[in-house]
Amino acid sequence: MSEPIRVLQVVTYMGRGGLETMLMNYYRNIDRDKVQFDFLTHRDERWDYDDEIESLGGKIYHLPKLNPFSKNYLNALDKFFKEHKEYQIVHCHQDCLSGVVLKVATKNGVRFTIAHSH
């Protein structure tokens, strides 16, 4: 059997808000043999859904707080995508700041990007 497609979900953190709960409902009900969600968060601490994500086979990565004007943030984001070429689909839930993340993802070879404002 082939490896599942890994979709990177970009969020602030995985607390119990509406966006996070919606993503978890999708994640619980998709065929994880075909599609697997991983999460790029913008907080260091662990949140409500982290244990469940890991139990379902997802990975959680942490970056500094999203700041499009910070050279440190942009460098960390660029480094992440250079080191994680396994992602060809990035689904970003950062409202108007999704463009910052998706531009860096595209620059690093991500083929499919989705900007989703909730």
Language model regions located:
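Short helix-capping segments at alpha-helix termini
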Residues: D31-V35, K85-E86, K107-V110
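Structural motif
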Residues: S2, N29-R32, K82, A105
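N-terminal strand-loop element at the rim of the active site
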Residues: P4-I5, Q9-N72
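Active-site proximal beta-strand in glycosyltransferases
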Residues: V7, I89, A105-H118
